[in-house]
Every structure is written in C-alpha cells, then in structure tokens.
Amino acid sequence: MGVIFFCAIFLRVYRLAQIPDILQLDEAGLSYNAWCLVHYGTDRYLNIHPFYAQNFEGGQSPLYTYLLVLLIKTLGQGNISLWLTRLPAVLASILLFLTGVKTISCIFHDRKFHIAAACFLAFCPYYIMSGRLALDCNLMLCCSAVSLLLLLKYIQTDKLRFLILCGISFGFTMYSYALSYFIVPIFLVLVTLYMLYTHKITFPKAVLFAIIVCVTATPVILLHVHCYSNGNPFIFWVSLFLRLLPSVCLI
C-alpha cells in the first residue's frame, strides 16, 4: 500500500509546472485573481475582497481562490507560479486518495478491495489529471469524499463528533463549486429522511446536523439571498424551490 501511495504522489507532483505543458484559461484567471487579492485586496476587475472572484464570463469558487491566496502569502512570499497555482489541486487529489481508500476499508474488510481502490485512485487518468490542473471544480470531489466518509463513520459508530464534523464538511463543500448548491441540499435531504426512516439518526440530531451545515455555509446562503431576491428572503426561497423542483421530480 505504501508503494501505491508513493506512486500516487509521484504521478501528481512530477514536473507539475511542465505537465500539462499549457496554461489552462481558468488557471490563468484564478492565479491572477489570487495574486491581485494578495497585493491589492481586489480581484482583477477591482471587486474588493469578493466572495466570487470574477473570471471570464463568470466567477470562480471561493475555496480554491482563497487557498491560493494563502499559499501566495506564505510559500510564495507574494509571488505566483504555475507550480504554486496547481498545489491545492495536488493536495486535494492526495487527500481524495487517502479518503477513498479509508472509505472502502470501512465498507469492505477484505484487503484486496483496499488495494484495488488504491490502485484505481492512484492510476486512473482522471484522478491524476484532476490533481495536475488548477480547476476549482476539482475541489468539490475531494470535499464530497471527505463528507461522505464522515457520514459513513457516523452511521457506523453513532458518535456525535462524526455528525458534527460531517455537517461542517458538507458546509465547506458548498464553497468548492457552484454545482454543490444543487447536489448537496438534495442529497442531504434525501439521506437524512432515509436515516430517520431507518432510525440511524434521531430528529434532534437531524436538526442539529442541518443547523451545522447552514451555519457553515451561511455566506453562500446570504450571497444567493442577495443575488436571486434583491434581499427579499421570501422571493429567494420561492425561486429556489422552483429551480430545484425539476430535479426533485426526476428523483
């Protein structure tokens, strides 16, 4: 297992700034926005400390942007490089590897499954490339995997600390990519109803879980209240219901 883990790291860090040998458009926008935030406190469109730094024809998720800001201030000492820009993707990919293997080990006790999962996560081209490109969407996969592992640990152990950590993790997932605004709430509603039905969670714990997720994701919620309703919460919730209704009907 150690050899597989070493190979996984090597495939993600070897010549990181040269392979791929192109600067992807979103990477360029992300790195320049982060650099501007470090030095001027604005994105490149002069928005002061934005929740969403503006990129070409839209915004970029805050988690990757502000992780990169932190790295530029610390490791980069104010300077930006392609290697530094891609470092959060590498760290997320390695964490995904560890989380995925741990999740499989919690479900299957046969070591062959653990090795198979490790090989798949280490050598699958998609997982390799997701760790070598600075795309904000790639962080959602890692955050979701961590959240699911913590949810699984709670179901298996019924320990409150795992439920709290799971709620925090799902809340942070909302900062990773815009698609999570639809997927995470629908998933959490369905899985909570299922756990209530199967007595895996009590109603007070379910309420606590929902509160933790909402508190952690409060900036995201406030942003969308402002964007979709001009500050009117009633209009926001009605518009959100209408947006989610087709997805719920399909489920």
Label for each model-derived stretch:
Residues 13-16, 28-58, 63-66, 70-74:
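Extracytosolic helix-loop segments that constitute the early lumenal/periplasmic catalytic or substrate-binding loops
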Residues 4, 100-123:
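Transmembrane-helix signature of polytopic, membrane-embedded enzymes
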Residues 105-111, 145-163, 173, 198:
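Membrane-interface transmembrane helices that cradle and orient dolichyl/undecaprenyl
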Residues 30-40, 172-175, 181-251:
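Transmembrane-lumen/periplasm boundary regions of multi-pass, lipid-linked membrane glycan transferases
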Residues 85, 89, 126-137, 179:
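Short acidic/glycine- and proline-prone juxtamembrane loop motifs at membrane-interface regions
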Residues 1-14, 95, 105, 115, ...:
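Start-transfer (signal-anchor) and selected internal transmembrane alpha helices
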Residues 83-109, 146, 150:
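Transmembrane-helix motifs of polytopic, lipid-linked glycan transferases
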Residues 8-11, 117-122, 170, 174:
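Short helix- or helix-capping micro-motifs
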